Amino acid sequence: MADNSFSDGVPSDSLEAAKNASNTEKLTDQVMQNPQVLAALQERLDNVSHTPSSYIETLPKAVKRRINALKQLQVKCAHIEAKFYEEVHDLERKYAALYQPLFDKRREFITGDVEPTDAESEWHSETEEEDKLAGDMKNKAVIAEKEAAAAEEPAPRGIPEFWFTIFRNVDMLSELVQEYDEPILKHLQDIKVKFSDPGQPMSFVLEFHFEPDDYFTNPVLTKTYKMKSEPDKADPFSFEGPEIVDCDGCTIDWKKGKNVTVKTIKKKQKHKGRGTVRTITKQVPNDSFFNFFSPLRASGDGESLDEDSEFTLASDFEIGHFFRERIVPRAVLYFTGEAIEDDDNFEEGEEGEEEELEGDEEAEDDDDAEINPKKEPSQPSECKQQ
């Protein structure tokens, strides 16, 4: 049988490799002669070579020196901005004192300690007149029946389950609430925001006021959020205003057998030698809204947090900010759902604008393709602080 592994003393594998290399070279030459391919490569090279950092590197030393001076000015601007936000915090403290009498009256109406007058109860919505005209005849037909039913049933005191209803209405909060939390939250009578005193480090405290209940003895549960309003020395250009940097919860004095933040499990253990089995019980953490008062700490031991812990802490900061900025000032609108509808409409508007912008970008790309056909489309007995 003839041996085909050599041809004129040259191994056939080498001949095949040389042939493939020659074909590859020819194909490369053909591709590089394509104007569209060359244009695409040139565009990519241009994008790489014209980044801001590469441009700065090409500037003369005297220009770089002036840019450094501008950066120093920018740092000074950041410090002035920080001072601005400190004064805003002082204004918030001042106006919080003006709001508080209104919030105190709100609590009295909610708890039923005070009944609003007819003048205080008068309210006309935008559609109330139309609804009144359309429903007059129907209301007259059933008014006697309603009055009779009302006479039989005692009127509830205040506005039952006011704050608990807000928790249910707001997704950010309802996600934290477990079924066994609900009976406790029905005893929540008020939520207050207290700002740090003048001259003290910037912070605010959320106070959750409860009526006496069967679950814990604290009349008030607190959560303190510590804030910072100063540029980071290592990265001063990242400053965008005050930020929450840490938080403290409080110790809840649970009554015996009522702690919903832990659960008791039973576990069987078998003795290796004797083979006997015993049952032990131990407590393990349990999902609950009331874990909100035992937060992770962002500082203290000097160790960095893992990714999951950082996410948990960031979510906690967002919830605290939401209580302060939205829930407490506009509680009745979250109770009725009107504020939630406003929030949803605002989010939908943002998405619509984003879609329009994307459409404009696509249109610009199409125009470029027509001009250059070679271009390839491209957030009191108070409980003890921890």
Swiss-Prot record:
Places the protein is found: Nucleus; Cytoplasm
GO cellular component: chromatin; cytoplasm; nucleus
Record keyword Cytoplasm present: yes
Protein name per UniProt: Nucleosome assembly protein 1-like 4
PTM annotation (Phosphoserine): residues: S5, S7, S12, S49, S53, S54, S125, S304
InterPro entries tied to this protein: NAP-like_sf, NAP_family
Gene3D superfamilies registered for this protein in UniProt: 1.20.5.1500, Nucleosome assembly protein (3.30.1120.90)
